[in-house]
Curated annotation (Swiss-Prot):
Superkingdom, natural source: Archaea
Stored Pfam families: TFIIB
GO CC, any one term: transcription preinitiation complex
Functional summary from the UniProt entry: Stabilizes TBP binding to an archaeal box-A promoter. Also responsible for recruiting RNA polymerase II to the pre-initiation complex (DNA-TBP-TFIIB).
GO BP of this protein: transcription preinitiation complex assembly
Family: Belongs to the TFIIB family.
Sequence repeat ranges per the UniProt record: 1-17, 28-109
Name of the molecule in the record: Transcription initiation factor IIB
SUPFAM superfamilies named in the record: Cyclin-like (SSF47954)
Source species: Haloarcula vallismortis
Keywords recorded for this protein, A-Z: Repeat, Transcription, Transcription regulation
Lineage of source species: Archaea, Methanobacteriati, Methanobacteriota, Stenosarchaea group, Halobacteria
Record-level Gene Ontology MF annotations: TBP-class protein binding
Length: 114
């Protein structure tokens, strides 16, 4: 069974049972991704800052929290000179490189970093 189908079924059951579902905070993924990529606390802190700043601007709406966190980790790794490739980050986060690229572009534009 595909992960997408499980998620869809979970949302359906939760809706039918009128369960309150809180949106997942992308910052919950930062420590795990950073640990698996052997990145520093500085990178984690910068990634959380990127998430906070860009989410305040409404960029998170409708986006996958895992992809969003992964892109923030990628951006933070570059900014802190602990470079990881999009492929490395995508593999750890189980998202595509295209997702990393798209969210990264949105985040750096929103942060005013070009």
């Amino acid at each position: 069974v595909e992960q997408k189908e499980i998620g869809r079924t979970y949302r359906y059951v939760a809706q039918e049972l009128e369960l309150k579902m809180e949106p997942v905070d992308p910052k919950q993924y930062v420590p795990r991704f950073a640990s698996e990529l052997e990145l520093s606390e500085e990178v984690q802190s910068k990634a959380n800052e990127i998430i906070d700043t860009t989410a305040e601007q409404g960029l998170l709406s409708g986006k996958s929290p895992t992809g969003y966190a992964a892109a923030a980790i990628y951006a933070a790794s570059l900014l802190c000179n602990e470079k990881k490739t999009q492929r490395e980050v995508a593999d750890v986060a189980q998202v595509t490189e295209v997702t990393i690229r798209n969210r990264y572009q949105e985040q750096i534009e929103a942060m005013g970093i070009h």
